[in-house]
Amino acid sequence: MALDDRRTLYVCDARIGDIRKFDDFGTLLGTIGRKGSGPGEFDRPVEVEVRGDRVFVRDLGRSRMFVFDLEGKLVSSTPVDEREGRWRKFRALPDGRFVVEMETAGETRLELFSAGFSRQKTLYRKAVPRSRIAVGPLREDIPLPFVPVVEWDVTPEGLIVAGYSGDYSLEILDPDKGRVAAWTRSFKPFEVADKDRKDYLAGPGRDLPAEAVRTLVFPKTKPAFEKLVVNGRGRIWTFLPSADPKERTVFEAFDADGAFRSRVILEDEWPRTAPVVFFVGGVWMAVAGPDGETSIVRYQITN
């Protein structure tokens, strides 16, 4: 999901194959693109970003980056070059450049790209254990359980916050000046219990072949945090794992300069994998219901 300067919400629907526009009250304003193989048509759109008067859509199925104006007119289409690593995520900076998460065997990198999607330099790199396996006849990509990963987000001012959940190390990066802050927070890891193993194997999309289940190795402990986001005021939130999945959601909040602010317990559940997009004073979230249907919900964030 993404927001433009008028707080119009853009929702990327990979299954239907379009981008849906909503106003601040959730009224459908229109769509961008459609399923197909022609100019400006999608196979499997997986990410959307908006900067200024341009909408950027990454299509995984066609391996292309599409650029539209705010009304949905196609401006350009560029192939996604994955020869130097697999694209996992991209975010637009306020000045029109992009940060792309690229993954190779044993390493995650954050690369800076120009407004025209040409690679400029590496902003961050981290050696990481293998986090996914390919299973089934279609070699479907399945995340491995409780493996430390790199999580990152972009502040409203255009700084990049990157963290490694293996050791709770965090960095704030300026795309031009480099690292401006770095720190490591101490933590006591939770053990991976038998219930965690059973819940993982019973999760959606985890109908693994018997051979994959037998060879799957679970780590002894959980990573330091499960998700990192930057809210609409530039504060950093790291969502912590728990010993019991039924416990309420807990995150730690840091100021924009990295100073620890507080530990917060939420009254409502916050799905760890839910796509979110922040604005000042609130957040839009894609929440999956028990019937498998996804709802787009707006929440107010209070002090």
Regions inferred by a protein language model and the residue ranges of each:
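Eukaryotic scaffold repeat domains enriched in small/polar residues
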Residues: 1-303
